[in-house]
Amino acid sequence: MDTQALCGLKAADFQKEIGGKKTDLYILRNANGCEVAITNYGGALVAIMVPDRKGQFANVIQGHDNIDDCVNSPEPFLSTLVGRYGNRIAKGKFQLNGKEYHLAVNNGPNHLHGGPTGFHARVWDAEQIDNHTLVLRYVSAYYEEGFPGELTMTVRYTWTDDNELVIDYRGTTNKKTVVNMTSHGFFSLQGIGNPTPTAMDTICEI
């Protein structure tokens, strides 16, 4: 929780109580001075500050500047965690062990990215272990958004000295269920500008 973050974001702008739980801003730093800024509302990435080939730092991920914009975003999955189930489940239903489950729908007749109040819209319990590591925890109740089983999720963000952001997802459940978590990052490798540049001049090596 650093008000002098390289990204310019302020912890105070992310501090609010939502549903009885407090939101905040967490800054991870590595030995290179690079930063990742994360809020525990939806586990959203709000800034990733890294240098270009000339050593100029820029934010390369789309994120919001304050908690109110996160909550009221017209793009609710902007760089957030997604769950219980990333992508669409057709017609908002699935079968498991011979039983059909009906889910909350938010994409026409389909269930998308965990539903209207999926993991992206939840306040996670947060523990910053050190400068490099943030651990988020959330317990998804039985039948939340229509899914069977109580699901306990732990997501660990690790920001390495190689400028790698490692996201580790672990879940335990008390009943057979389906889980397909992901992070819905919106990247712009040329840096977030105004207007934001397109990807047409970006060379990506995989």
Q: Which role does the model predict for each range below?
A:
Residues 2-206:
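An exposed, glycine/acidic-rich loop-and-rim segment of catalytic or binding clefts
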